[in-house]
From Swiss-Prot:
Protein name in UniProt: Large ribosomal subunit protein bL31
Entries under InterPro entries matching the protein: Ribosomal_bL28/bL31-like_sf, Ribosomal_bL31, Ribosomal_bL31_sf
Annotated GO biological process: translation
Originating gene: rpmE
Top-rank taxon: Bacteria
Keyword RNA-binding: yes
Described function: Binds the 23S rRNA.
Keyword Ribosomal protein: yes
A GO molecular-function annotation: rRNA binding
Keywords: Ribonucleoprotein, Ribosomal protein, RNA-binding, rRNA-binding
Family, per entry: Belongs to the bacterial ribosomal protein bL31 family. Type A subfamily.
Species name: Roseobacter denitrificans (strain ATCC 33942 / OCh 114) (Erythrobacter sp. (strain OCh 114))
Amino acid sequence: MKADTHPDYHIIDVKMTDGTVVQMKSTWGKEGDQLSLDIDPSAHPAWTGGSSRLLDTGGRVSKFKNKYAGLGF
């Protein structure tokens, strides 16, 4: 087998929407980096059972609506 074919697997801090920080193993970033979530199981309507506002942090929903505005969706 080839050596060094797998990415580095290390511990990072994941910051939830409510501010709590959980340590997880990941290949993202480097040891000790912090990943901040925009949405997580405690705030997602699929897991909370409620209807929540739609988060458009990347502008993807707005871009989609503008692109297909003339189709009457």
